[in-house]
A protein has these predicted regions:
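Polytopic transmembrane helical bundles with strong interfacial aromatic enrichment
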Residues: 2-247
Length: 247
């Protein structure tokens, strides 16, 4: 009991002295986990849609099977990414109340747009997943387009918030330093946003292409006669090569 009391006292003392390192550690842990899922969630949708297009346009059954398989990965990464993203949204207010109190009116603008993109993506992910055998091929394909666009829009919105901290703009402060007027377009399209957003989107697509190529080559190493693995690897390479050049 004495040891427990002593340990509790030490913990309380450390937190009372400086809570900032603990807040940083907690947010770093959440971000480190979330950022792994973001490229997957953004890119799987695009890869799935391209495979789906090939299946509908050319009647490629291998592409259809690939799209159906990838759509499951897309749904899982979206769901888990949504959970970690929700945790992050709470952490901004709980861990950094002074920052949000002073700058939240401007900093929150990109997150408002991210929320709109998120709900759009959530709606159409559900329609796309459950529409495989319930919708005709072309209408089903078009339900995947909003998923891709919303995924890109959401990631760009979050990157815009980060870019705004690097190049603040689009706001007016009063004598106390509180933000009293905001120009949403200037906040989102700040000077640092274009380069950071392009970097993030290209990196997201490149990550998924590399993962797919690596997995399919591993399958070919195990079973060289599997034609579908060859097609999938070539398919991913075609998508990844331009991204590598852009990167």
């Amino acid at each position: 009991a004495t040891d427990a009391i002593a340990s509790s006292a030490v913990t309380t003392t450390v937190l009372a002295v400086n809570p900032v390192p603990w807040a940083r550690a907690q947010m770093a842990f959440t971000l480190a986990f979330h950022i792994i899922l973001v490229p997957l969630g953004v890119s799987w949708a695009f890869m799935t849609l391209i495979a789906n297009y090939r299946a509908v346009k050319h009647g490629d059954r291998d592409a259809l099977m690939l799209a159906q398989r990838w759509s499951k990965y897309m749904a899982v990464t979206f769901a888990v990414g949504a959970v970690t993203g929700t945790v992050l949204s709470f952490e901004f207010g709980l861990l950094w109340p002074r920052f949000m109190g002073q700058w939240g009116a401007a900093f929150g603008v990109p997150f408002a747009f991210e929320g709109l993109f998120f709900f759009t993506e959530a709606i159409f992910v559900a329609i796309y997943i459950f529409g495989w055998r319930r919708l005709r091929p072309w209408p089903h394909f078009w339900t995947g387009v909003p998923v891709v666009l919303a995924g890109i829009g959401g990631s760009v919105s979050v990157v815009a918030a980060n870019a705004w901290m690097n190049a603040p703009s689009g706001f007016t402060q009063n004598a106390e330093g509180t933000v009293v007027a905001v120009d949403p377009l200037r906040v989102i399209f700040n000077d640092a946003m274009p380069l950071q957003a392009a970097h993030m989107v290209v990196a997201a697509y490149l990550v998924v292409n590399v993962i797919v190529i690596g997995y399919e080559l591993f399958e070919l190493w195990r079973q060289p006669a599997v034609i579908a693995a060859w097609k999938n690897a070539v398919f991913a390479a075609h998508g990844g090569s331009p991204m590598m050049v852009l990167k």
